[in-house]
Amino acid sequence: MKPDEAHLLQALCEVRDPAEMRRVLSDLLTRSEAAALHKRWAILCLLRDGVPQREIARRIGGSLCNVTRGARLMRNPACASAALMDRL
């Protein structure tokens, strides 16, 4: 891992307040990047809830390819996003 990447990750780990995290992400991401991140998270959450892939694509307005990519990710036992969801 590059030192600047490690520094960014450490800084993000310091944020404890959702409102502060929103401000930090707003500083770091463009609106379209933030929207893409939100869409990816929403896809993973719906997959976790057992919503069928085609229904997710319809609800989210995304492509079935993106949903399928998320489903493949969620099937991976090493999926960090699934582990994070388990802690929420």
Regions found by a protein language model. Give the residues of each.
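Short, solvent-exposed alpha-helical "recognition" segments
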Residues: 70-85
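N-terminal helix-turn-helix DNA-binding core of bacterial DNA-binding proteins
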Residues: 31-34, 45, 55
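The DNA-recognition helices of helix-turn-helix-type DNA-binding domains
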Residues: 50, 63, 74-75
